[in-house]
Amino acid sequence: MNAVTPTLPAPIGLLAELTHRCPLRCPYCSNPLELDKRSAELDTATWQRVLAEAAALGVLHIHLSGGEPTARQDIVEITRTCADLGLYSNLITSGVGAALGKLEALYDAGLDHVQLSFQSAEAGNAERIGGLKNAQAQKFAFAERVVALGLPLTLNAVIHRGNIDEVPTLIDLAVTLGAKRLEVAHTQYYGWAYVNRAALMPAKADVDRSIRVVEEARERLKGRLVIDLVVPDYYAKYPKACAGGWGRRLMNVTPAGKVLPCHAAETIPGLEFWNVQDHALADIWAHSPAFQAYRGTSWMKEPCRSCDRREKDWGGCRCQALALAGDAAATDPACSLSPLHAKIQALAIAESALEIAPDYQYRTIGGAPAVPQPEGASA
């Protein structure tokens, strides 16, 4: 008897990377090393068509991101299109530059939610990490206005060696600013973070302590603040399901219109990414070679293929497998069943123990930095 092919579920969310332009230069940015220039960005009408196709496909949430999405002159128009289509819009912003000046217009256009990044709870450290002076004062003013308008506010804090001691202070900051949710997201080492890994990697003892702080705060602040925690892969026992599983829940549209299964997928050579300027979104979701490549479980090698967790973590991260093992189809080295797992943990311990961390290689458009070689490329 032939096996029945399961119906492909619709994606839940779409990450709309409207631009790679950003006033911050964070060394852990998940954007690609080769950033799209302004001249390559999709125009307003194309984004509106993409949003309409997303709604028809069944997408519920649109994450308006970048770079800094408010750098787009048409961000209000794009947000209004989301509202007109019944799409829940989430603005992922640095809160600096043009963000505050456009906030009320975004609110009037129907914006549903704001996610505001904080590089540090301390102004000087925030400037050092983000590479922008006077950023903190702009963020405070932006957060205050978001709450005054009645918009739900989530703070996002990417945690690494340079700010891991501030987790308690960042939790207090979220409460003080009136946020409903805080994301304590340990750095995921893709994009610029992979280049800066040795400068960003925290000690395992510090990671464990930060997790205990979050767990205590969750109990203490129950009903006041929801705290999400993303733990670092290099110290994990099992990998996370990348983007909820490759090609299962999310899709990412780049500023130039490429549609990716995850934001780092372009690091995998040989994948064919379809563009919204050439294909309808539904066609891309169902038939794009890039989405098909690692969707489901048939592509898996052992030990993933026979693992009881194969439909929980879906093999972990393909981009991380490539970066660390030299093979995108390999077991994610974050998994304890990977032959590289112990080596990767030892690498993290060694980098975190550096007495003086290397200088940051800041995110910039034009001229990608040198990329570390895969740990397992010659294994």
Curated annotation (Swiss-Prot):
A Pfam cross-reference name: Radical_SAM
GO-annotated molecular function: 4 iron, 4 sulfur cluster binding; cyclase activity; iron ion binding; oxidoreductase activity; S-adenosyl-L-methionine binding
Known pathway: Cofactor biosynthesis; pyrroloquinoline quinone biosynthesis
Enzyme Commission (EC) number: 1.21.98.4
Enzymatic reactions: [PQQ precursor protein] + S-adenosyl-L-methionine = E-Y cross-linked-[PQQ precursor protein] + 5'-deoxyadenosine + L-methionine + H(+)
GO process terms (BP): pyrroloquinoline quinone biosynthetic process
Cited InterPro entries: 4Fe4S-binding_SPASM_dom (IPR023885), Aldolase_TIM (IPR013785), MoaA_NifB_PqqE_Fe-S-bd_CS (IPR000385), PQQ_synth_PqqE_bac (IPR011843), PqqE-like (IPR017200), Radical_SAM_PqqE_MftC-like (IPR050377), rSAM (IPR007197)
Binding sites annotated in the UniProt record for [4Fe-4S] cluster: 22, 26, 29
4Fe-4S as UniProt keyword: yes
Ranges where the Radical SAM core domain occurs: 8-220
Cofactor(s) of this protein: [4Fe-4S] cluster
Domain of life of the source: Bacteria
Subunit structure as annotated in this protein's UniProt entry: Interacts with PqqD. The interaction is necessary for activity of PqqE.
Family of this protein: Belongs to the radical SAM superfamily. PqqE family.
NCBIfam families named among the record's database cross-references: PQQ_syn_pqqE, rSAM_more_4Fe4S
Cited function: Catalyzes the cross-linking of a glutamate residue and a tyrosine residue in the PqqA protein as part of the biosynthesis of pyrroloquinoline quinone (PQQ).
The protein's name: PqqA peptide cyclase
Organism annotation: Methylobacterium nodulans (strain LMG 21967 / CNCM I-2342 / ORS 2060)
